[in-house]
Design a protein with these regions (language model features):
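Conserved small/polar residues in nucleotide/adenosyl-binding loops
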Residues: 272-274
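Canonical Radical SAM [4Fe-4S] cluster-binding loop centered on the CxxxCxxC motif
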Residues: 4-44
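Radical SAM/AdoMet-radical enzyme domain recognition
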Residues: 40-63, 70-184
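A C-terminal junction/extension of Radical SAM enzymes
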Residues: 167, 173-176, 180-263
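Conserved, mostly hydrophobic/aromatic
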Residues: 16, 20, 24, 63, ...
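Short, small-residue-enriched loops and turns at beta-alpha junctions
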Residues: 16, 35, 67-71, 159-162, ...
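Short cysteine clusters
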Residues: 20, 24-27, 253-256, 270
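N-terminal [4Fe-4S]-dependent radical SAM core
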Residues: 1-13, 23-25, 55, 230-241, ...
């Protein structure tokens, strides 16, 4: 499926709910109004639309939110997506709080991989970012995912004055674990617009000073992590890798291959809504 800019779109993000059980300062702080229940698409409607996208060439679906695991029966949605002809991969982005308890059902449904948000390794910083005391449950979810063997990526948003002093420690999680730790630049939109950005190039320089052998992965090797905007680096001997998504300083719009379907059924291409 090609858009008006002749980009090949084959990746669909489904925002299955606007609800979340965290209140991250840059995403959904306290006071954000939730949608009326009848305004949110049913799973049947999501599956019907996903099937139409598959007929147009979409082969990968990512289930997101809000927090997708707060919506009951999301494993049934995953199973339904996996049954659609042409859909070869179904993945999920989650904050991890409910992951440990729901992972068996998700694996049985055919979930192919999971991305888990983790901005800090310190419980008190986690609570300051999210306004919730859920750090232990997130780490439990990460451990459960790693133990299950499902491919795991950790997503971290570097934040000035919040977690900038522990970014090397977060990157080092990839040293002894078979996962990708990805650093995503703060987007200057919504609540993040008032927050300064720590750039991907700045982080790469920091990590190269910490680990002199820190170097980019060959394109053929990093291709196995998906065809998104992340650029991957590693250190010889590490079990995992470190990725950078330069949402501000990068220039990857021309090669974008994805669209988002919001929980209300709006189609989002970049920052445009249809």
């Amino acid at each position: 499926m090609f858009d008006s800019a002749q980009r090949n779109i084959h990746y669909l993000r489904l925002s299955v709910t606007d609800l979340c059980n965290l209140r991250c300062r840059y995403c959904m702080p306290d006071g954000v109004e939730k949608l009326e229940r009848e305004a949110v698409l049913t799973y049947e409607e999501f599956l019907r639309l996903a099937a139409l996208f598959a007929r147009c060439g979409v082969d990968t679906v990512r289930v997101t939110g809000g927090e997708p695991l707060v919506r009951k029966g999301v494993d049934q949605l995953v199973a339904g997506l996996k049954s659609i002809p042409g859909i070869r991969k179904v993945t999920m982005t989650t904050n991890g709080i409910l992951l440990a308890q729901q992972l068996p059902a998700l694996l049985a449904a055919g979930l192919d991989s999971v991305n888990i948000s983790l901005d800090t390794l310190r419980p008190e910083v986690f609570q300051s970012i999210t306004a919730r005391d859920e750090f232990g449950h997130v780490m439990e979810g990460i451990r459960a995912a790693l133990d299950s063997g499902i491919p795991v990526k950790l997503n971290c948003v570097p934040q000035v004055g919040v977690n900038e002093g522990e970014l090397e420690d977060l990157a080092a999680l990839a040293e002894s674990r078979p996962l990708q730790v990805r650093f995503i630049e703060m987007m200057p939109i919504g609540y993040g617009a008032a927050m300064p950005c720590i750039s991907g190039p700045e982080l790469r320089e920091r990590f190269a000073r910490r680990w002199p052998e820190f170097s980019p992965l060959p394109a053929a090797q990093s291709a196995g992590f998906g065809d998104g905007p992340a650029v991957y680096y590693t250190v010889p001997g590490w079990k995992g890798d470190v990725g950078f998504i330069a949402a501000v300083h990068g220039k990857f719009c021309a090669s974008c291959n994805r669209v988002r379907l919001t929980s209300q059924g709006f189609l989002q291409i970049g920052r445009a809504h249809v």
